Amino acid sequence: MSTELIKTRAIYSGTGRRKCSVAQVRLVPGSGNLVINGIPGESYLQFSPNYLRVSYAPLQVLGLLNQYDIHVNARGGGLTGQADAIRLGVARALCSINPENRSALKSEGYLTRDPKVKERKKYGLKKARKAPQFSKR
């Protein structure tokens, strides 16, 4: 009886959040493709070089730019929040690959969750802090 060796592909995952956005990121050894919600990353992020640079930043710091494919399930928020959530998810996935990556990513600030979220509107005000115009008389 012959035994077959089944080759498994390693999949590393990480979750990132920013504002109202949540990105579930999976890194698969590959050629550096970015796929977001089944759409190529360039078209999903509207060919914006800034959003693409932010999404690839953790891989670029470690010099692993064309070694992993990034598959993302992103929901909520806008493109800026989703791009930053992808960056955090990629950084966390890279830490699960090799714990030695943590110090380089931490020094760049890629492992820090940005705590800023939209402040709620208060009653009696027009927005969160904007008050109606004051009239002395």
Curated annotation (Swiss-Prot):
SUPFAM superfamilies assigned to the protein according to its UniProt record, in alphabetical order: Ribosomal protein S5 domain 2-like
Entry annotated with the keyword Translocase: no
Gene3D superfamilies, per the entry: 3.30.230.10
Cellular compartments annotated: Plastid, Chloroplast
BP GO terms, sorted: translation
Compositional bias of kind Basic residues: 118-137
Annotated spans, Disordered: 116-137
Annotated signal sequence range: none
PANTHER family named in the record: RIBOSOMAL PROTEIN S9, SMALL RIBOSOMAL SUBUNIT PROTEIN US9M
Record-given protein name: Small ribosomal subunit protein uS9c
Chain's gene name: rps9
